[in-house]
Amino acid sequence: MDVIKHELYDTLVQKYKSEILAYRTTLRVYFENLVAVGEHPTHLKDMDELIEKAACANDKLKMLRLMYKEMYSKL
């Protein structure tokens, strides 16, 4: 049962890291390649939403680590 707990913890950590990376990559496209999204009239709104989602995933990751890192992370 302990193995499952560690795997669940690790899966959540990877989920949040993956979400953050996906949002960061999309934001990079906006910043570096505006031509790719040139016909999209809501750049700032969309970018703000991506930052909000990344911040939420980051907060979840921090809270998970704060609450459970000592118990479930593999050192």
PLM segments and residue spans:
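Extended, charge-rich alpha-helical interface modules
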Residues: 2-75
